[in-house]
Amino acid sequence: MELSSQSVLSYTDKYLTVDGKPWFPVMGEIHYSRLQPEDWERELWKMKNGGVDVVSAYTIWIHHEEIEGEWDFSGCRDLRRFLSEVKKCGLYCFIRIGPWAHGECRNGGFPDWLVKKQETATEAGEAVPCSDQANKRKMVLRSNDPEYLSYVRRFYEKIYEQAKGYFLKEDGPIIGIQIENEYGHCGGFTGPEGEEHMRTLQKMAREIGFDVPLWTATGWGGAVTGGMLPVMGGYCEAPWDPRTTEIEPSGNYIFTKERNDHAIGSDHGLGEDITFDMSKFPYLTAELGGGLQVTAHRRPIATGKDTEAMSLVKLGSGCNLLGYYMYHGGTNPEGKRTTLQESKETGYPNDLPVLSYDFNAPLKEYGQITDTWRRIRRLSMFLHDFGSELCEMEYIPQPGNPSDPGDLTSLRTAVRCLPDGSKGYLFVNNYVRRQVMKNHPGIELKAYGPDGRVLADFGKVDIEDGDYFFFPFETEVCEKDHEENRGMCQQRKSGMEDGKDHKNSRRLAAPITPLCLLNEGKSQETVYVAYGHDRSGKEQQGLKQTNVHDRMGTECFDLKQMLAPEVADRLNREGMRLLLLTEEESLHACKADMGGREYLLISNGDVIREEDGALSVRMEGKKDEELFLYSYPELLSTPEGFEKEKKEQHPGTLLDTTDMTLYTRKLDFIPSLRAELTLHDTLESEELHALLHVEGIMPEMEEAMVVLEYEGLSAEMRQIPPASGETLRKDRRAADSFYTGQPWEIGVKRFAGADGCADFFVVVHPLRKEEAVYLQKWPDMSKGYACKIRGLRVAEIRRIQLRFA
């Protein structure tokens, strides 16, 4: 969706609109002040290629005015430059201007000097009514206290100076603003006083000049919204939960019309109910956990499946905006007087790493592309081509769908369909993070309407622990009746909404998940791309290997043979083809527009479309690496340095990856990156100390990664300056980590000297058996503690440009 200053953005009670038409965007959070400015454009392109339409970003007050009156919009704090990069990448933007943000920042983003203006200390974020004269406070934070509002106005004015010229009405990227965060839920006032404060902040922002079509506010946990669009959230776990034990299954894996996540912010005190009328607002999310930020006491590891399954459940439950927090991890900037992370020392409930805000996000702290990125991209591809129609499909609860998140036996299902029931999707989830779900072999899958009528019958499907998917169905008008077909595409006679039996109608329902459309509405043939999940053909059809499958190292069934002939008949009549992928292939697939024609590309690297449509591939540079690229349709010319595999063209309607054209290229990488670790004796301490030397860091590398596998409570690296007379500052960190059991990945390119080298002092702190911390898997504690480095490796992240003659 391309917007301009003439575009009219609004919303109905069901969805967002652009010029009156439904719009289903994908939004992802990135904090410009937690990234290097020279990396912004590169990382924004990755976000766009991951399916993000709108970036959201906190403007964190303490990052801009740590010292009262000393404003800093330079370097990583240069909001104006960031907005120009957002525009350059063709993205849109929501700025979350607070003034309180949270974001695991010191004081929730409030500068220390502002907090100290309260004469009497209060619990972090807690508001006290101005009428409480007994306290005789000079100022009450997060209230309509005139003094507080005067500081907020000054902050808003500074942010506006940076944003001016970048609003949508000026052909800029800013389409929306969020006021405050979790107000009335994590601090602030509730009830009429809270609503009035939210309206006051919005009014102030408008007076200053902020002019956007969309204004939002936190909607969960009793937060007040001031009449603005409520946005919801949901996380697969709760690292803020004070417990250090395994916690109950998340409610975010249950299909439900309820929008409230009762777990968010439980460390600050929980408001039980939402405060707005759900019937008046669309179901939008701004804080679906793209990952999880670990805390000192609780360190769950979010996976790609954790996030994708949760996202699918939200789609099935009627959500019409997928907004992820965080989409891109980062590193806290260095403070001028203090460190800038959330900590118990400042009265907040959790201790966070001083620097790392990795979040196990789809794009990690140093821009590493993850499985989560690929899985979110897969959903986003579907939404870009089918989302506007999905917006108009209502959520319909299904019989047998459980309401208890702890029910690991019942199959979880939902339907979204058009009001007349003529078209829709059946959503199925048999995945709950870190839980074993009951298998459902040969289960009859049916989609039911609100009146109990069968909308679609998918026949018998094997559903196993960990499966989640959605299948399409629709009504087709036929020339004659059809008998029930028990093949993989089921057809049903159906009574329509008037209760009459229409003999010339049937239901088409296929157990494949749509991925995207190629060349819809263009002069070329339209290709419907989908991927398969069903296992019932395994024994009957046997395994089928293709070149793509061989390279992916996966097994595939002949999905084409698992679909009934009526599918081909239908596609032929509509002038379409169906391209079927396996699960693994779909994770490596992307669309690319070249010369006005859309192509589906599958590669063993990550294909990124950049400025002016240029294509590049990101992958780890290894010796004798082969890059392969599959395309449908065949590219007009072979990329430079690639060889094309000659193949026969198949005229059929049903296609799979054997019908794609293969291009291969031998890469002449000569890895230069090396690292050496030298352990130091620490006789007086159980800490592990080491010197790390890295060399061969080259400018052409996108990133130079050092990967440390360690066991301990935490670790940090301090850079040793080049020989220049400087002494090592013990308090100046280059990177840090809370141990989770995952390898610690550090991007060191930013630390390289002119000689391509960097040196660090590494400290690993011991993890003791009695430590009050939740870990998914503990290391060997036979000595009563763990403190060691088990492995060291390096990884060169390379960018390979695809050039065409």
Where are these regions (language model features)?
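N-terminal carbohydrate-binding accessory modules
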Residues: 1-54
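The substrate-binding groove and active-site-proximal loops of carbohydrate-active enzymes
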Residues: 25-36, 61-77, 134-154, 180-194, ...
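Aromatic-lined substrate-binding rim segments of carbohydrate-active enzymes
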Residues: 41-108, 206
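Aromatic- and acidic-residue-enriched segments that line the glycan-binding/catalytic groove
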Residues: 69-77, 99-136, 189-194, 198, ...
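Carbohydrate-binding surfaces of carbohydrate-active enzymes
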Residues: 117, 126, 137-138, 148-164, ...
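Substrate-binding cleft/loops of secretory-pathway carbohydrate-active enzymes
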Residues: 186-206, 210, 218-258, 403-406, ...
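Glycoside hydrolase catalytic-domain groove-lining segments
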Residues: 226-296, 352
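Aromatic-lined ligand-binding clefts that engage carbohydrates, nucleic acids, or primary amines
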Residues: 695-733, 737-738, 763
